[in-house]
């Protein structure tokens, strides 16, 4: 999944409501005061993200680093492809581990953190293989706790965040350099994928940031997707027996983790009725695309059965075009594979009321307690 939607507008508890109201009043292209132009229509959203007319600067949310975008494009593609293939092989080989991990959530789990930690435990060996320096493992675990979990960054001061960033960069740079010393080494984990793909004279900060993007995508975004799916089923237990793949798709429709994609205009042009100036950022809001009343019947309702007929056109949970997330199938398949044994074995109930999503660069579920009660007769 995309690591984050890095160009999201300022966050706040009422932001989604404000965006929906602006969409209702002004249509599929509208301006949010102080933020800029937003797109809520699927056709225009695809136009912006596909960028076939080169109206926007080449942009990849995943490969944005502290020192600029990792380039060239073929390097991005090589890393993305190798990471996807490694994750695909790992998840297939370790699918039998999932029922054991699911049991650890019972009888009650604090979500969404428990979902992120489940993903970290399951994917730990493909993030950092056996033999990785223990200090690197420790700092990556700290990054999960203090940066990946929903709301974690807001709970730490700027200085402590900076110190953690410095520790992570130093540890990952040293481990990357060590791994590159072996000319015969082949990728056995995601850090290898990044380390061995980087060219001579590479920027160690960029290498570290790309690995951290992989960490955020696998443990963060995919963990949020899992938690959202369980949250929705916990609110609508009558939907628990829907096909897991349909549950995942409908979850991503209602609550796309990557909910906002910003694209800077490379030149002046028109987008629908709006004039876009060079340098202006256009925000594609997939949250609004996925709830567009002109494209979805009962858009606010959780209805997994709407996916039994195939994929809908007004659906962009992983972006669109050349820079769409290459790991989409891995992420959705893994979450479906977790839901299958979990919902076969347990009824799930959300124990808290009147909850609001955590709106930030990623759209995360609200903190809540999820109760898992053993099913007497399995799935109906």
Model regions: which residues?
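Cytochrome P450 catalytic-domain helical core, especially the substrate-recognition surface
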Residues: 1-15, 35, 40-178, 375-380
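Conserved cytochrome P450 K-helix/beta-meander segment immediately N-terminal to the heme-binding cysteine loop
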Residues: 53, 285-310, 351
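Conserved cytochrome P450 K-helix E-x-x-R motif and the immediately C-terminal K′/meander segment
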Residues: 8-23, 241-274
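Cytochrome P450 heme-binding "Cys pocket" and the immediately downstream C-terminal segment
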Residues: 330-363
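Central I-helix of cytochrome P450 enzymes
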Residues: 123, 190-251, 335
